[in-house]
């Protein structure tokens, strides 16, 4: 069956008749001809298109599935002679290269008039190439990939790709049945970039790059810079352009007014495909913002949105770094979701995965036949934990690819924060590697200096270009200066996940209350280092999968006690210095582990379910925690200032009690007291000093509306000799604030 060339618009009128054949063109050099047909020629534009020769202008066209090809000049059609192998040529007695089109006839009688891709000058400028060569193109997506545009007065798409080791590159499309023979690209010198402008190609066209390696192998690769991709399991890239009109100008204008460290920051972590399985980006925009706003969270954190082939990877094995996953809709549909969240007053953080990428043969791995995005040293290229490739952070073009990608999501999709995954695996050369499987750095150390420099460059660039954006590190070691500015030697992140607090506190609450006295330090140790970095306290997806159990199921005791433990824990967490993050489903005490196949168990909240009130009670507490948190500056204004915290009771191990004060910038305190024992403690003394003339309970996780027993302090409590005596409910946290008598 003949292949239909849809790369060019249909002619506006009838195809001109063919008056006759052209003169014979000089033959191609056999070597050039062989390389051209093999897809291994660096400059096909020097062979194809129109060129002066003795006697006129020679035209040469490569259309392997055509029956006949003609040239139309000034409305007259001239038939080119077949040279076999899909080549057609001829000479017209012209003084100069004219404006012309091609008429291509296919075997089944279909005929099209088209522009010739090989009559155009490069559609990529010298400045772009210079910046790419230096690794400093901060808007790389505007230079590489598939860019719909008007070039020399003709609409089409410019295709560009970085493949410095390739002998040749061709554009293969759906309309050529993935045969790239007709569309070889030209090399733009030492930049390693290949380019071709295809007239008439528009949005929705599926394409790949056909790479001819220096080893003689030919294979198809998805575009590393593709801004859209087919829905998996299909793997082609898709030409796209955004026409989205944003409605979040007010949000974007004001998001940088207050530093994130001095503002409320309560995060709801979401896996979009499973939050409400089956919903698209636009359908999620109808439900997610309203739900998050109702619960009082200030931000959502989206597990990776970039395209990935394997759903159960949850997005952490990315193949399309510049393309939102097509599973839920188009790139503009994703913009619609972000816009809806912003208009609801919700910030959007996105998980970003620059540590590694999968080995799928159509993706980044050995992209041009050689290690390109990954290091050439196999000891460094392989990630031992995940069976993936690591990025070559020492290569300027690779760093540019990743730094520009971070900027891309912030500028093109209005993302407010990037949570960088697996930072520790990037920073250490010996991460998960045995002796002999890694090589020390130039100073003999285990630190990956190139990865460190990359993270510093990424952070500095994002903060310079994108005011109000915050970067967050998932860094699980004691690497110093993760959130210290880059100009003082730090990595430059805005926040860091406090993995130590998470592990220690979950370890503590998992013990039976009678044994917690022996683990008291696990709840207090975090304050030893609480101000060494700017922390987020994460109860993330990683803690509720793979046998770790859901948060409520980690707790000891019967159902009432497990819920009480969760409520007490959340009250402690929200009051502790640092921002907080909670994964979906934990806000209503889902008992089952998270599964990406079914998502949260929303049916637990249904009125007809006999225990729905128990789950709604925890959900109501989370709503109240966020409401109180946002309205109480003492809980967020001085998260990074040691003067914003004071222990009141730090060593009451026998009682399982913790008490501390938080202070706002104006000195107004909040007293948080947690009783992790199952007994009521009456007249419990706390030396609060002269902070207030009286204290009023403002939150009690044991309140009946949250599913508790209703034990508490309904009346204001006055200090005597600097101490107050209050009732501590069992397995509960209470917050008290100054009360004006």
UniProtKB/Swiss-Prot annotation:
Family matches, as InterPro entries: A-amylase/branching_C, Branching_enzy, GlgB, GlgB_N, GlgB_N_E_set_prok, Glyco_hydro_13_cat_dom, Glyco_hydro_13_N, Glyco_hydro_b
Residues the record marks as active site: 421, 474
Tagged with keyword Transferase: yes
GO terms classed as biological process: glycogen biosynthetic process
Keyword Transferase: yes
Highest taxon, organism lineage: Bacteria
GO cellular component: cytoplasm; cytosol
Pfam families: Alpha-amylase, Alpha-amylase_C, CBM_48, GlgB_N
UniProt cross-references to SUPFAM superfamilies, sorted A to Z: (Trans)glycosidases, E set domains, Glycosyl hydrolase domain
Its job: Catalyzes the formation of the alpha-1,6-glucosidic linkages in glycogen by scission of a 1,4-alpha-linked oligosaccharide from growing alpha-1,4-glucan chains and the subsequent attachment of the oligosaccharide to the alpha-1,6 position.
Xref: NCBIfam families: branching_enzym, PRK05402.1, PRK12313.1
Quaternary context: Monomer.
The protein's name in its UniProt record: 1,4-alpha-glucan branching enzyme GlgB 2
Organism: Streptomyces coelicolor (strain ATCC BAA-471 / A3(2) / M145)
Gene name linked to the record: glgB2
């Amino acid at each position: 069956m003949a292949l239909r060339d849809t790369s060019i618009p249909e002619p506006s009128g009838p195809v001109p008749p063919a008056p006759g054949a052209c003169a014979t063109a000089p033959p191609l050099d056999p070597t050039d001809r062989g390389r051209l047909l093999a897809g291994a020629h660096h400059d096909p534009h020097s062979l194809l298109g129109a060129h002066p020769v003795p006697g006129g202008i020679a035209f040469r066209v490569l259309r392997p599935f055509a029956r006949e090809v003609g040239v139309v000049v000034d409305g007259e059609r001239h038939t080119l002679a077949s040279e076999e192998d899909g080549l057609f040529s001829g000479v017209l007695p012209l003084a100069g290269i004219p404006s012309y089109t091609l008429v291509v006839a296919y075997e089944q009688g279909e005929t099209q008039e088209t522009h010739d891709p090989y009559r155009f000058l490069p559609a990529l400028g010298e400045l772009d190439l210079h910046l790419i060569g230096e690794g400093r193109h901060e808007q790389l997506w505007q230079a590489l990939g598939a860019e719909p545009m008007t070039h020399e007065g003709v609409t089409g798409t410019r295709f560009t790709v970085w493949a410095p080791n390739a002998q040749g590159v061709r554009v293969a499309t759906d309309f050529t049945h993935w045969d790239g023979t007709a569309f070889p690209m030209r090399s733009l010198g030492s930049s390693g970039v290949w380019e071709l402008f295809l007239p008439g190609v528009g949005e929705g066209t599926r394409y790949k790059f056909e790479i001819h390696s220096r080893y003689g192998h030919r294979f198809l690769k998805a575009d590393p810079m593709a801004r859209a991709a087919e829905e998996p399991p299909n793997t082609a890239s898709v030409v796209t352009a955004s026409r989205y009109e944003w409605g979040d100008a007010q949000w974007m204008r004001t998001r940088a007014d207050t530093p994130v460290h001095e503002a409320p920051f309560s995060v709801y972590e979401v896996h979009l495909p499973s939050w409400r399985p089956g919903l698209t980006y636009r359908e999620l925009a109808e439900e997610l913002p309203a739900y998050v706003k109702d619960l009082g969270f200030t931000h959502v954190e989206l597990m990776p949105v970039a395209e990935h082939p394997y759903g159960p990877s949850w997005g952490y094995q990315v193949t399309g770094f510049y393309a939102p996953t097509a599973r839920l809709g188009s790139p503009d549909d994703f913009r619609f979701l972000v816009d809806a969240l912003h208009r609801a007053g919700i910030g959007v953080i996105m998980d970003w995965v620059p540590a590694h990428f999968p080995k799928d043969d159509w993706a980044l791995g050995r992209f041009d036949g050689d290690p390109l995005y990954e290091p050439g040293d196999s000891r460094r290229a392989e990630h031992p934990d995940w069976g993936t490739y690591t990025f070559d952070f020492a290569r300027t073009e690779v760093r540019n690819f990743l730094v520009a990608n971070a900027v891309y999501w912030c500028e093109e999709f209005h993302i407010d924060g990037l949570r960088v995954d697996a930072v520790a695996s990037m920073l250490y050369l010996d991460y998960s590697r045995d002796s002999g499987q890694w090589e020390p750095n130039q100073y003999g150390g285990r630190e990956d200096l190139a990865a460190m420099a990359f993270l510093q460059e990424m952070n500095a660039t994002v903060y310079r270009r994108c005011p109000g954006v915050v970067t967050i590190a998932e860094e699980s070691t004691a690497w110093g200066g993760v959130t210290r500015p880059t100009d003082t030697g730090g990595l430059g992140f805005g926040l860091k996940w406090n993995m130590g607090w998470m592990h220690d506190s979950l370890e503590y609450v998992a013990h039976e209350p009678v044994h917690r006295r022996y683990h008291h330090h696990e709840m207090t140790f975090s304050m030893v280092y609480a101000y060494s970095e700017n922390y987020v306290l994460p109860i993330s997806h990683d803690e509720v999968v793979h046998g770790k159990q859901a948060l409520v199921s980690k707790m000891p005791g019967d159902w009432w006690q497990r819920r009480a433990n969760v409520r007490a824990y959340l009250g402690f967490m929200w009051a502790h210095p640092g921002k907080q993050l909670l994964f979906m489903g934990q806000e209503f005490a889902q008992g089952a582990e998270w599964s990406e196949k079914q998502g949260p168990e929303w049916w637990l909240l249904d009125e007809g379910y006999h225990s729905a009130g128990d789950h709604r009670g925890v959900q109501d507490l989370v709503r109240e925690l966020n409401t109180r948190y946002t309205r109480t500056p003492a809980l967020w204004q001085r998260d990074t200032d040691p003067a914003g915290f004071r222990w009141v009771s730090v060593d009451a191990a026998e009682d399982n009690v913790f008490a501390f004060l938080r202070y706002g910038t104006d000195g107004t305190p909040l007293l948080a007291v947690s009783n992790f024992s199952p007994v009521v403690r009456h007249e419990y003394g706390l030396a609060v000093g002269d902070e207030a003339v009286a204290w009023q309970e403002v939150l009690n996780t044991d309140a009946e509306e949250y599913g508790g027993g209703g034990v508490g302090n309904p009346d204001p409590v006055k200090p005597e000799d600097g101490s107050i005596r209050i009732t501590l409910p069992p397995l509960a946290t209470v917050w008290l604030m100054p009360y004006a008598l």
